Amino acid sequence: MFGIAPNSSRPRRRIIKRCVKTLSLLFACLLAPAYPQSGNPASHTDPINLTPQVREAHDHFYNLDYDGALTRFEAIQKANPQSAIATGYVLMTLIFRELSHQDLLDTTYYAHDSFLTSKRSVTILPATRDRIESLTNSAIALCDQQIKANPNDANAYFARGYARGMHAAFITLVDHSYVSAAKQGYASRSDSEQALRIDPDYADAKMAIGIQQFAVASLPRILRIMIGITGVTGNKEKGLDLLREAAAHGVVTNVESRTALSLFLRHDARYPEALAVQSGLAQQYPHDYLFRLEEANLTKDKGDGPGAIAAYKRVLEDARKPNYFIDPRLQMTYFGLADTQRGQNQIAEAAQNYLEAAAQPKCTDWLRRRAQLNAGEMFDLLHQRDKAIEQYRQASAGGGDQSQADAARRYLKTPYAGR
């Protein structure tokens, strides 16, 4: 069907595995929420984005106060029942709050060992899932009505693409439905292209197009065929340029465009450029725990182990200050610190920080067992077999997440001897 010989299934699997990382980055980019810049009321955007109420709600969001942001966005939606973008902001906040609870907001998982090939099962409460689906459908329906009434409504096209993009991110990260999500991502791009045709200065619309341009250019033809986007073109540098334009001139997508830009530069190992973008975000929002964590992650990725260790420790130090961060998921910082110390051959320190990650009260079972497995490996390298066995037993215990069980059982039989 695809012109591949029967004995080439193994190379094909390798191609798909390599490209899963790129797909994961596509949806990771859809996760960065919007924050309106200070702009002039004549900006090419829905007027609601320039109101103090929306700005205040985003302030709470960017301090990772999801409950405070949700309360405010719900009030905005109630006061503006015909605003699709207001509905989209409620959708965004619900999705982010849930992904935070699931430890799915550390982009290291998207840029490296892809969650798409993991065995992890993510459980979402039915009421939460139902509300996310309802909000998505409501936002799209509102846009459909507005486009029918006015085919030149750029705001409606943009808001529809925004809702589709958010939903695509959700079903990818939670359900691993990346084929369906890729099609939604393409629909989001189409909506953005239409918004730009109507208003060439609608800078926010360039973000979805830029993401698709880069991601599609990174995929070989076989994978495009498999996910049904064979007619879509892509160009990496054009995609990056579009993201830069949205970051510079967008009202709604300036922050998420920078986040996407940083992720894609990271994907292509352009670490100094990625770190420069991410450091700008961390400086602009020093109380955003995720931006600070990502700055440390990128420092690690560019090969500056000592610098990354110092960056992770600064995050932990700030987290000890009263009210500096809101509900920081410190397990992600401890895990990143341990990984970096492991790479620097600081084995005892790595073991301790894997244990710290596992001990965090809000750590998901999935991340806890990953930390326990890694702690066991460190104890084996330290020739502390009894401690290693204890960690492997916890990582392979019945019930809960089983994604680390096979490796843990293997090391129960034979001590880990790698690095």
Model-identified regions with their sequence ranges:
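Bacterial N-terminal signal peptides
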Residues: K21-A34
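Short coil/linker segments at helix-helix boundaries
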Residues: S38-E56, H60-F73, Q82, T93-N152, ...
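Amphipathic alpha-helical segments of tetratricopeptide repeats
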Residues: K78, S190, R197, A247-A248, ...
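Boundary/linker segments of alpha-helical solenoid repeat arrays
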Residues: Q82-A86, N155, A203-D204, V252-E256, ...
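TPR/TPR-like (Sel1-like) alpha-helical repeat modules
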Residues: R189, E193, G231-N235, L240, ...
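Alpha-helical adaptor scaffolds
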Residues: N254-R266, T299-P306, K313-L367
